[in-house]
Amino acid sequence: MARILITSAIPYINGIKHLGNLVGSQLPADLYARYMRGRGHEVMFICATDEHGTPAELAAAKAGKPVEDYCAEMHEVQKEIAAGFRLSFDHFGRSSSARNHRLTQHFAGALAENGFIEEVVERQFFSVADNRFLPDRYIEGTCPNCGYDKARGDQCENCTKQLDPTDLIDPRSAISGSTELELRETKHLYLRQRALKDEIEAWIDSKTDWPVLTTSIAKKWLHDGEGLQDRGITRDLKWGVPVRKGSEPWPGMEGKVFYVWFDAPIEYIAGTAEWADANGKADADWERWWRTDRGAEDVRYVQFMGKDNVPFHTLSFPATIMGSREPWKLVDYIKSFNYLNYDGGQFSTSQGRGVFMDQALSILPADYWRWWLLSHAPENSDSEFTWENFQSSVNKDLADVLGNLVSRVTKFCRSKFGETVPAGGSPGEREHQLVAELQQQLAAYETCMEAMEVRKAAAELRALWVAGNEYLQSAAPWTVVKTDPEQAQAMIRLALNLIRLYAVISRPFIPDAAASMMASLGCEDWSWPADVGRALEVLPPGHGFTTPEVLFRKITDEERAEWQTRFSGVRT
């Protein structure tokens, strides 16, 4: 049994996330976690809300609430929606937790002690209209690289280029919109990433199995232009982790907080500590996942994120870990994703464009969305959500292929043999061929899941469903029963066991439907089918079942048209 540590990029607290956020991190991470648990491995799956920095302050101000209250409220909202999508986190934490405060301050102290922190006096925009310094994300303007007119002072979300506020063309305050900005002096802490560049580059070079998307972004940031730059890790904000050198005050840093991108990844570790606290466990129970001197040397750590998060996870967070000179676990594999676009435009939380997670759940159950998003995951290039494609995929894959098989088999058995697994007959050549075919296809499915090739895994799973349908079509038990009822019983006995097999292997993608299939079969045996032949004998003759309700209903043309109009691209 392996030990798998899984973290998903933690979502900002500033509102409900859209489907592009979901498919770019949390959902594929959940798929992998569920699969690994299903194979019998020990899994720790951690996520949290990212509650500090400019997004939180701006969103709270817009909502007219104190930032602490806003974050507490939105954490519960995001936690509830995550549960609605059946995201199986072992813990869903908060970056504003006391654990993360202490751990962030600890890392800063360790970095300073090892000479990787520099105090820098810099010139920063001060808004006369707002009477305050403006951290990078409080400034908007036009990106000098791609011309996007809503770029932020730290990064352009359109082209992902890292920016300095002074790089922006026509900068303005994100608070008031005022262009009356002055450059004034202020002192900040910088993480000396350049001093760690050789270590980071050697570490990245050692990860020969990483996706091209991950390594290409990391190396671009390492080498493009002037190469890897030192990174400011403090901000002139009120809300955040107060700057301290470990447990001690940091002279000259009074009233400042750590930059959100410094403390947010540390929440992966802190969130695991929160898990221990919430479950009455000792520190040793979370440290065995994170400290290589306390049991984490055999852990495989996998991160999931959108491509815009890759630079921070391949450069800045590893620099924090390496520079601490402490035995913390570094990530083994980073699964990154391109963007999911929406009907000809971009999904965007800040711009309110696209279908958001709460809206999605209000019109269809989670499995419909999970299946479409994962089977169209933007792995090798950007992908696009369209209502026509969504309707087609749901109707063909879920309703026609899987749902239809479950319905036909259970209803036919009930009408001809009753609601028990029939005992007659024995498998023939056709059944043996099916078992061999399924064994081969299952191996292909497992290979894709192990490699986190999400779209390919979905295609292999669908192929497994199709194989069952093709068997039923060729075997035609509804015809055979007229001349050889014993043989028809053998076919249906296999088909009922096939439903259980599908429930087990489909669970990572469509957990609710899998649970419904198992419940209708009166079965609680979720063991992974190492041997397909044996797996198709788990339900013995005489075992009772119930005929389930429709597993997946079809989306009508009228519904599709209505939703397309209702979700025309802007959330109001």
UniProtKB/Swiss-Prot annotation:
A motif ('HIGH' region) lies at residues 11-21. Pfam families: Anticodon_3, tRNA-synt_1g. SUPFAM superfamilies: Anticodon-binding domain of a subclass of class I aminoacyl-tRNA synthetases, Methionyl-tRNA synthetase (MetRS), Zn-domain, Nucleotidylyl transferase. Its EC number is 6.1.1.10. One of its GO terms (molecular function) is metal ion binding. Binds 1 zinc ion per subunit. CDD domains: Anticodon_Ia_Met, MetRS_core. This is Methionine--tRNA ligase. It comes from Cereibacter sphaeroides (strain KD131 / KCTC 12085) (Rhodobacter sphaeroides). The lineage of its organism: Bacteria, Pseudomonadati, Pseudomonadota, Alphaproteobacteria, Rhodobacterales. The gene is metG.
